[in-house]
Every structure is written in C-alpha cells, then in structure tokens.
Amino acid sequence: MPIGVPKVPFRSPGEEDAAWVDVYNRLHRERLLFLGQEVDSEISNQIVGLMVYLSIEDGTRDLYLFINSPGGWVIPGIAIYDTMQFVSPDVHTICMGLAASMGSFILVGGEITKRLAFPHAWVMIHQPASSFYEAPTGEFILEAEELLKLRETLTRVYVQRTGNPLWVVSEDLERDVFMSATEAQAHGIVDLVAVENSGNFT
C-alpha cells in the first residue's frame, strides 16, 4: 500500500506551532535538491525552477544537488547543467547510487572542488543515443547531424571540467564506461569520495 511522500514537522520563523510539510519541501528549504529518477523535461523544470528561486532568495548560500539517476534526455539535462553555471550560489553535486549518462554530465557540472561521490556510488559516461531506430533515411540523417553537435557539446564540457585531454574523453564516450567512486575521482568527474560516517548535513 503506497504511503505517499513522508511528512515532517517544520516551524517557520516567528511561528509557535510547527506545520507538517512533505520531506522534500523541508529539504528544499535547507537548499538540498534531489535528482532521483530519469532526466526528463518535468524533473528538469522542477530542479531549474528550484535553483533559480533559491538563488534569488539567497545568492550567498551554496546549493546541494544529490544525484541517483540512470540518465535520460540530453536537452533537459543540459538545461540543468546550464542553470548550475548561471545561478550565483555554488552548486555541490553528490553522487549516491548511480550517476549514468546525463546523470554523470550533471554531476561533473558541479562547482569544481565541490563534486563528491559516496564510497559505493557508480558513474557511467557514454555518447548521446538516437531515438530514431526505424525512421525514414532523411530524418535519420538530420538526427545524426544533431547528435554530432550534442556529442561535441558534451565532449567539450567533459574536457573542460575533468582536465582530461580531448582524445581521452572522445575515446571514453565511444562506449559505456562504468567507474567506481575512486575511479571517477581519478577521472576528474568528482573531486572527493566521501568517508563513511563523516557526513554532516545539518
């Protein structure tokens, strides 16, 4: 039986009684954001909206984006990445579980020195895939041209933010490359691997 989103007590400043709000609402007030699903337009718009709102509310306090995502659509993922570069606060990215495909692209987009993976997390990178498997030839050619542009964009970002040479990134994007947390750190996708029992999110 589904229980819905858990609720937790929250007391607004100046109020005596606490109100019950859903746990994500409470965490958002602490500037903690979550990408825990496939990247699509809906979740992208939610995260972009939250980042912009929290940046306007207080541009000096950092944001924390927790990622456990199998990837998803490229353009919505790029929208999240671009917003992370646009907003005033630094955006910490934290990989928990899996950051694959566009999940890893968003992970690498965090503020350099503030990208972290949990010790048993996994990261996977690869090139963008086509959605036209049985399309007419003309549509497939147009799709291939757009995919090439997107691949160049993703490659350029990975090169810039990992410090790896172009040829290394290009070769990695040719196939699915899975990395442990420490391998992702060596690859420049994250800067730190969390130590167990050292977290403090209060």
Curated annotation (Swiss-Prot):
- In terms of superkingdom, the source organism counts as Eukaryota
- Output this protein's name: ATP-dependent Clp protease proteolytic subunit
| Gene giving rise to this polypeptide | clpP
User: Which GO MF terms are attached to this record?
Assistant: ATP-dependent peptidase activity; ATPase binding; serine-type endopeptidase activity
Q: What is its EC number?
A: 3.4.21.92
Q: How does it assemble?
A: Component of the chloroplastic Clp protease core complex.
Q: Which family does it belong to?
A: Belongs to the peptidase S14 family.
Keyword tags: Chloroplast, Hydrolase, Plastid, Protease, Serine protease
GO cellular component entries:
chloroplast stroma; endopeptidase Clp complex
Catalyzed reactions: Hydrolysis of proteins to small peptides in the presence of ATP and magnesium. alpha-casein is the usual test substrate. In the absence of ATP, only oligopeptides shorter than five residues are hydrolyzed (such as succinyl-Leu-Tyr-|-NHMec, and Leu-Tyr-Leu-|-Tyr-Trp, in which cleavage of the -Tyr-|-Leu- and -Tyr-|-Trp bonds also occurs)
PROSITE patterns recorded for this chain?
CLP_PROTEASE_HIS (PS00382), CLP_PROTEASE_SER (PS00381)
Function according to Swiss-Prot or TrEMBL: Cleaves peptides in various proteins in a process that requires ATP hydrolysis. Has a chymotrypsin-like activity. Plays a major role in the degradation of misfolded proteins.
- Name its species: Piper cenocladum (Ant piper)
Q: Where in the cell is it found?
A: Plastid, Chloroplast stroma
| Keyword Plastid attributed | yes
